[in-house]
Amino acid sequence: MVKPLPRLRLQGFNNLTKALSFNIYDVCYARTEEERQRYIEYIDEQYDADRLTQILTDVAEIIGANILNIARQDYDPQGASVTILISEEPVIDKKQAGKELISDAVVAHMDKSHITVHTYPETHPQEGIATFRADIDVATCGVISPLKALNYLIESLESDIVIMDYRVRGFTRDVKGKKHYIDHKINSIQQFLAKNVKSRYEMFDVNVYQENIFHTKMHLKDFDLDQYLFEERAKNLSFKERMKIETLLKREIEELFHGRNLSE
């Protein structure tokens, strides 16, 4: 739960911009080129624009935002994008979102409050590794907090690795003229994760408190080879094959978690 600071009487609108960014990775091993292609097709179907729209619509509901407009697109050969414009106050009926022209007042608000997702399936050309990355951004202006959607987003996607950034920008002024650069208490993004999520992941923080920048990386603690194999079972592989695949997968996970290639 996001704990606000003692209630402030503001001069006008709360001008703080809060932005939560996710990189979520799913890692898989598919032995043959045909299996890797089927993995891409599977991911493309699982996370098409319709499914992503539903996830982001749920996010808007969770954080208490009103939907202004929805734009979505599936790409050829793979991938999808969805952008939802949101506000604190309802402007048009939810059923009409994406069907009506938006007023100038709403257009002026677009760059401030939105939820976006882009997907990036890809495969290694030789080694059998296949990955799916979803980039999600939730940016709000005012009292709405994107942190409320943390756990839902992690659970909604196949999250082997999660990289999160949260920042608060701008200021809001109280009736006495004093500027406030944040309106809630936070020491770490981890504060807002559910216990069952924290118990499953190893987590690492890099926070710059004086700049209101918070960064958390997570990867699953337990490694079950069957969870990473596509159209295959570990029991059907030789010991040598299992060790080779496990080494490849663990290396891929470490490199994605740290954001750099490891030396051979």
From Swiss-Prot:
Essential cofactor(s): pyruvate
Active site as annotated: 113 (schiff-base intermediate with substrate), 118 (proton acceptor), 141 (proton donor)
Example of a GO biological process term: spermidine biosynthetic process
EC number: 4.1.1.50
NCBIfam families in the cross-refs: SAM_DCase_Eco (TIGR03331)
Subunit architecture: Heterooctamer of four alpha and four beta chains arranged as a tetramer of alpha/beta heterodimers.
Residue numbers of Pyruvic acid (Ser) PTMs: 113
Residues of the site described as Cleavage (non-hydrolytic): 112-113
Protein name in the entry: S-adenosylmethionine decarboxylase proenzyme
Cellular component aspect of the GO annotation: cytosol
Annotated Gene3D superfamilies: S-adenosylmethionine decarboxylase
The keyword Transmembrane is assigned to this record: no
Function: Catalyzes the decarboxylation of S-adenosylmethionine to S-adenosylmethioninamine (dcAdoMet), the propylamine donor required for the synthesis of the polyamines spermine and spermidine from the diamine putrescine.
InterPro entries: AdoMetDC_fam_prok, S-AdoMet_deCO2ase_bac, S-AdoMet_deCO2ase_core
Post-translational modification: Is synthesized initially as an inactive proenzyme. Formation of the active enzyme involves a self-maturation process in which the active site pyruvoyl group is generated from an internal serine residue via an autocatalytic post-translational modification. Two non-identical subunits are generated from the proenzyme in this reaction, and the pyruvate is formed at the N-terminus of the alpha chain, which is derived from the carboxyl end of the proenzyme.
Similarity comment: family membership: Belongs to the prokaryotic AdoMetDC family. Type 2 subfamily.
SUPFAM superfamilies (alphabetical): S-adenosylmethionine decarboxylase (SSF56276)
Cofactor binding description: Binds 1 pyruvoyl group covalently per subunit.
GO molecular function, one term: adenosylmethionine decarboxylase activity
Gene (name only): speD
The reaction(s) this protein catalyses: S-adenosyl-L-methionine + H(+) = S-adenosyl 3-(methylsulfanyl)propylamine + CO2
Xref: Pfam families: AdoMet_dc
Keyword terms, alphabetized: Autocatalytic cleavage, Decarboxylase, Lyase, Polyamine biosynthesis, Pyruvate, S-adenosyl-L-methionine, Schiff base, Spermidine biosynthesis, Zymogen
